């Protein structure tokens, strides 16, 4: 892969003190070209998921209805339901927004944005439009220093050095994931961001006005706990954290794919971002020679455990590339 680890990784049992630096292109574009040349029928999988709208509408309705039922519940009950139920729904919607960022519900981009704003409602915090801007750069510039905001900052990586700090980082990783690009690579908001913000504030205010603060708190708690020490959140780590220096993207082939828009098929997704999650398994079926030899996971919970307990793994365990030089 043409990668080199930073100082401190060479010694067994010691956490890296720098990222893994790659001096080759990210692997997905090359693999995409090879697979399409060998298996051109892959192109038949391209295009929107016709059931995306119905699936999103069902989850949004169920989560908002649940929030209204908990308006007079105890805080213990609200937190319990949020962790064991609401977190799965809100994380499902977060990954629906990921799907929509690739225009995989409709062929018209603006329709996907509107559906993303709708899917955003139970999450409680406006993020759909902003996520799309940064996520597409993650695909186009995977690992590129200063552009790919999926990678932890230097401050995060230097602060998180042991089991305890990694545990805290995992609990709050959703905050780091959301706030990192706003500090490191802020983008000026546009009309779509303001639309997302206004509609979200209207929903939040309506929840408080008609049902009380506890209903809104349930929605936000569902988002927070579902993005931390939670099985669904394991994909944040499993996708690109390097447990093997020879591989920078990892797939997950476990049952939670059914609830997460099959985001676990992450090598397949980066190879073919125009294929909706419901069809990604077919990529592996058509071209098994490209995927069966790659390391993969069957448990996101195990990935979280490995990340926390392995003393050689931490926020520095990511592959990075130097930004391309601009023509003078």
Swiss-Prot record:
Keywords, A to Z, come to: Endoplasmic reticulum, Fatty acid biosynthesis, Fatty acid metabolism, Lipid biosynthesis, Lipid metabolism, Membrane, Oxidoreductase, Transmembrane, Transmembrane helix
- Is Coiled coil found in the keyword set? no
Protein localization:
Endoplasmic reticulum membrane
Q: Where is this motif: Histidine box-3?
A: 266-270
Question: Mind telling me which CDD domains this protein's record contains?
Answer: Delta4-sphingolipid-FADS-like (cd03508)
Q: Where are the transmembrane segments?
A: 50-70, 78-98, 114-134, 164-184, 192-212, 217-237
Q: Where is this motif: Histidine box-1?
A: 98-102
Name the Gene Ontology molecular function terms of this record. Answer: sphingolipid delta-4 desaturase activity
Question: EC annotation?
Answer: 1.14.19.17
Cited SMART domains: Lipid_DES
Database matches in Pfam families: FA_desaturase, Lipid_DES
Q: Which PANTHER family match?
A: SPHINGOLIPID DELTA 4 DESATURASE/C-4 HYDROXYLASE PROTEIN DES2, SPHINGOLIPID DELTA(4)-DESATURASE DES1
What does the record give as the function of this protein?
Answer: Sphingolipid-delta-4-desaturase required for the biosynthesis of delta-4-unsaturated sphingolipids and derivatives.
Its name, as the record gives it, is Sphingolipid delta(4)-desaturase DES1-like
């Amino acid at each position: 892969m043409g990668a080199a680890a930073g100082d401190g990784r060479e010694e067994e049992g010691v956490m890296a003190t720098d990222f893994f630096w790659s001096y080759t292109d990210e692997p997905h574009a090359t693999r995409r070209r090879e697979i399409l040349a060998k298996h051109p029928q892959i192109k038949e999988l391209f295009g929107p998921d016709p059931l995306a709208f119905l699936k999103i509408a069902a989850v949004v309705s169920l989560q908002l209805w649940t929030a209204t039922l908990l308006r007079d519940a105890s805080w213990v009950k609200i937190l319990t339901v949020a962790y064991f139920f609401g977190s799965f729904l809100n994380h499902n919607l977060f990954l629906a927004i990921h799907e929509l960022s690739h225009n995989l519900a409709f062929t018209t981009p603006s329709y996907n944005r509107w559906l993303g704003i709708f899917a955003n409602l139970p999450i409680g915090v406006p993020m759909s439009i902003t996520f799309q801007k940064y996520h597409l750069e993650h695909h186009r510039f995977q690992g590129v220093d200063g552009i790919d905001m999926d990678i932890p900052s230097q401050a995060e990586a230097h602060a998180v050095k042991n089991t305890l700090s990694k545990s805290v980082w995992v609990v709050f990783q959703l905050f780091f994931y959301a706030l990192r690009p706003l500090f490191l690579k802020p983008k000026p908001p546009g009309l779509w961001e303001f639309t997302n913000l206004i509609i979200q504030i209207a929903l939040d205010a309506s929840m408080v006005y008609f049902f009380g603060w506890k209903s809104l708190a349930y929605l936000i708690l569902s988002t927070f706990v579902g993005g931390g020490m939670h099985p669904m959140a394991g994909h944040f780590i499993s996708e690109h954290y390097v447990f093997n220096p020879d591989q920078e993207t990892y797939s997950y082939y476990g049952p939670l794919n059914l609830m997460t828009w099959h985001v676990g098929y992450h090598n397949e997704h980066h190879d073919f971002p125009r294929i909706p999650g419901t069809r990604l398994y077919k990529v592996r079926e058509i071209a098994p020679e490209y995927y069966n030899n790659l390391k993969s996971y069957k448990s996101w919970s195990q990935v979280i455990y490995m990340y926390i307990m392995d003393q050689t793994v931490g926020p520095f365990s990511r592959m990075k590339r130097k930004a391309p030089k601009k023509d003078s």
